[in-house]
Curated annotation (Swiss-Prot):
This is Glucose-1-phosphate adenylyltransferase. The lineage of its organism: Bacteria, Pseudomonadati, Pseudomonadota, Alphaproteobacteria, Hyphomicrobiales. Coiled coil: none annotated. Belongs to the bacterial/plant glucose-1-phosphate adenylyltransferase family. Involved in the biosynthesis of ADP-glucose, a building block required for the elongation reactions to produce glycogen. Catalyzes the reaction between ATP and alpha-D-glucose 1-phosphate (G1P) to produce pyrophosphate and ADP-Glc.
Length: 420
């Protein structure tokens, strides 16, 4: 079954994005927002990748389930994803946890976040449901996963990829046979089983699932009636289907979208401060691992109206310049020097400041004569004159959130405490 021969299966699919998680390993970066709403890549939010994959794959019915501190996420979705047309059989629904099933029941798990909205799914009558995690960064054609699901007659198809075995404790780990039928599935095991012939690698779930809608609804009703269930796909639904049905693995390499500039399949959890910093800073390389300039697979997002970036002053020691950096619209670099730095919308960096290896979120303001190295600066933070970060590890650890690898997360409450 291939595109151009038959109608794309994506036309008959609905994408359901789970976007309610906090992402606590990002520490204070998610104090005010859910992980899917965290900024990424200069102008996007993390959730834009899953949504753009769905749109670029041809899926035109999308729902997003939200829960933890959802205001900024909902505002972003309303502003940036409001172009769907019902008269063209398109839809975009935002589904906050709202006690729709019981007066004392929020979303109890990932499966429950779908179960509580079964009536909305049924109202659109899709043949397939593509369940997505809204907190990963990657480019993927879900049409190819749908094709494998149909061709193999699966009850559920699970997106998977190889990771280092040492990292697999954070994921669902599976073992498959020669036809990619899943034989076992363990959610976040303390001792992940290795892949055959690859003792240091494990095959893990990406948190992406394809179901026939009818089968999924039956499974959700069965799970909801089980008082011993945690109502979670990875812990309950998928292991049950592995034992009692047919669960098939879909390898990410088969559907990863790569431009001519991308040599390997790119997928990032970006779930820790270190991983988040590294994934963003990688974009400043000459040839980054993730190509955001791929016009054939754009990452859609809310396009805030801003003037172009501006660089001013041209004297020794006070020259507005940026080398190997990404500078978004509305930024003003006033006599400051940037190296391997990513600035989101509306950032201002004032004279005599030196910034290197920095991820600076929207509308932060870096005052004069600062030296910042290997930092993540939260949105709207006001960095005071002369602040130095990245040169004294002990001082940094007392004042900011410093990781073991030396990355400092800076938020406004941390800055406010400097004067106390």
């Amino acid at each position: 079954m291939s595109n151009g021969v038959t109608a794309p299966l994506a036309r008959h699919a609905m994408a359901y994005v789970l976007a309610g998680g906090r992402g606590s390993r990002l520490m204070e970066l998610t104090d005010r927002r859910a992980k899917p709403a965290v900024y990424f890549g200069g102008k996007s939010r993390i959730i834009d990748f899953a949504l753009s994959n769905a749109l670029n794959s041809g899926i035109r019915r999308i729902a997003v389930a939200t829960q933890y501190k959802a205001h900024s996420l909902i505002r972003h979705l309303q502003r940036g994803w409001n172009f769907f047309r019902p008269e063209r059989n398109e839809s975009f629904d935002i589904l906050p946890a709202s006690q729709r099933v019981s007066d004392d029941m929020w979303y109890r798990g990932t499966a429950d976040a779908v179960y509580q909205n079964i009536d909305i799914i049924e109202s659109y009558d899709p043949k397939f449901i593509v369940l997505l995690a809204g907190d990963h960064v990657y480019k993927m054609d879900y049409e190819k996963m749908l094709q494998q699901h149909v061709e193999q007659g699966a009850d559920v198809t699970v997106g998977c990829l190889e990771v280092a075995r040492s990292e697999a404790t954070a994921f669902g780990v599976m073992h498959v046979d020669a036809k990619d039928v899943i034989q076992s599935f363990l959610e976040k095991p303390a001792d992940p089983p290795a892949m055959p012939g690859k003792p240091d690698r494990a095959l893990v779930s990406m948190g992406i699932y394809v179901f026939d809608t009818k089968f999924l609804i039956e499974e959700l009703h069965r799970d909801a009636a089980n008082p011993n269930s945690s109502h979670d796909f990875g812990k309950d639904i998928i292991p049950y289907i592995v034992q009692h049905g047919k669960a098939v693995a879909h390898h990410f390499d088969k559907s990863c979208r790569r431009s001519h500039a991308e040599d390997t399949s790119y997928w990032r959890d970006a779930g820790t401060v270190d991983a988040y910093w590294a994934a963003n800073i990688d974009l400043t390389d000459i040839v980054p691992q993730l190509d955001l300039y791929d016009r054939e697979w754009p990452i859609w997002t809310y396009g805030e109206i801003t003037p172009p970036a501006k660089f001013v002053h041209d004297k020794d020691g006070r020259r507005g310049e940026a080398v190997s950096s990404l500078v978004s619209g509305g930024c003003i670099i006033s006599g400051a020097a940037l190296r391997h730095t990513l600035l989101f919308t509306g950032v201002r960096v004032h004279s005599y400041s030196q910034v290197e290896g920095a991820v600076i979120l929207p509308y932060a303001d870096i005052a004069r004569s600062c030296r910042l190295k290997n930092v993540v600066v939260d949105a709207e933070v006001r960095i005071p004159d002369g602040l130095v970060v990245g040169e004294d590890p002990e001082l940094d650890a007392r004042r900011f959130r410093r990781t073991d690898s030396g990355i400092c997360l800076i938020t406004q409450p941390m800055i406010d405490r400097l004067d106390q």
